[in-house]
Amino acid sequence: MSSSLANRNIYTVSRLNSEVRLLLENEMGIVWLVGEISNFSAPVSGHWYLTLKDSQAQVKCAMFKGNNRLVNFKPQNGQQVLVKARLSLYEPRGDYQIILESMQPEGDGRLQQQFEQLKMQLAAEGLFAQTRKKPLPENPRCVGIITSRTGAALHDILHVLKRRDPNLPVVIYPTLVQGEEAAIQIAQAIGRANTRAECDVLIVGRGGGSLEDLWCFNHEIVARTIAASEIPIISAVGHEIDVTIADFVADVRAPTPSAAAELVSRDHRHKQQALHQWQAKLASTMRHYLAQQETQFARLQHKLDKQHPQARLERQQQQLDELSLRLEQKMQQRLATQQQRWDRLSHKIELHSPIHLIRQQRFNLIQQEQRINQSIQRYLIQSRHQLALLSEKLDAVSPLATLARGYSVTRTTQGELVRQSAQVKPGDTLVTQLMDGEILSTVNSR
């Protein structure tokens, strides 16, 4: 008897309970369990103890305070819940029990499971990838709002937009944001906004609520419609702690509707500052361009002064005329471009700034244009005057000018220039060049 017992693996009670606990924890892993709460207690330790049961069985459960503080409701006896748990054994008493890691009301639990499944599916398809998200426009021309016409979210968005950018156009696409038909209506509103293409950013959202209240923003049709939108979309659903599938798919997630309005609006004071910066940049660009043209003209004038032959002078004169014309055309084009830019800026200011400021800035631009045109005209007159002086100097040394003073040039009929009487003999015919024509003569003697 003693020898047979020695060959057996004999457990102590504590060892048996320990190995059973390890077996349960390692082999079973995480389980999801639905049941009714009974015998709920919450002692001063902060841990929760309860029993989960159905019509045929029950099991003891423990939920330690590190996990139960994340539960957003107070469990009640008789309440149906969905729990995420692991199996274990309380070794001192040998009690089989469930260690709870999370707990939700049973209805919320089903929705949460659907949420996680759809989230995993869409993530696998790449709908949450940052690479497919579109940037928000820096200065939206029109903002679309997809929400309930009677909800607090619309009031909050419009209030922020009126305060920050009162002249920003807004288009409201009213839709249900709660209930069975809400998801389809939201998707249709997004599609309608893309078809009409009147806005360059959309805010899709509503105020806070329960998981069921916000569930329309977790529908697959809403997620795929947001992903397919050509217009950037900001999701603004509930409060900062509320997270929906729409938040993951949208190009930008705002924690609240008011925050979404902040994202799409710029303070009108910033726009006035940007206008002043454009004006300063325009003036600096014009001064720099004129300085470059003056330097180039000075170089050309220096070359012209150093080259006196008539043909070269004529070429330089032609180049000067062409450069003057190009300069004038360039200045006119530049002024026209700047005028167009100014007109666009003025149009924006008419929407966002006092009218008298726009008129004053336009008056200043007209004066500046007049001063520039006057400077160009004076510059061209001076250039033509200098060219006339150079032409007079050239005429002073021209052979034609010498003929005009009464001198003549004599050549033989072969075109040889006659400088000495020894070059001719009696009977030769000579051609004498005068200012206004030629004379043929015959040599009688020399």
UniProtKB/Swiss-Prot annotation:
PANTHER family from the xrefs? EXODEOXYRIBONUCLEASE 7 LARGE SUBUNIT (PTHR30008:SF0)
Instruction: State the EC number(s).
Output: 3.1.11.6
Provenance organism: Vibrio cholerae serotype O1 (strain ATCC 39315 / El Tor Inaba N16961)
Recorded GO MF terms: exodeoxyribonuclease VII activity; nucleic acid binding
Q: How does it assemble?
A: Heterooligomer composed of large and small subunits.
Identification of the protein by name: Exodeoxyribonuclease 7 large subunit
State the family named in the UniProt similarity comment for this chain. Belongs to the XseA family.
Record keyword RNA-binding present: no
Has the keyword Transcription been applied to this entry? no
What Gene Ontology terms for biological process does this UniProt record contain?
A: DNA catabolic process
Keyword annotations: Cytoplasm, Exonuclease, Hydrolase, Nuclease
**What the protein does?**
Bidirectionally degrades single-stranded DNA into large acid-insoluble oligonucleotides, which are then degraded further into small acid-soluble oligonucleotides.
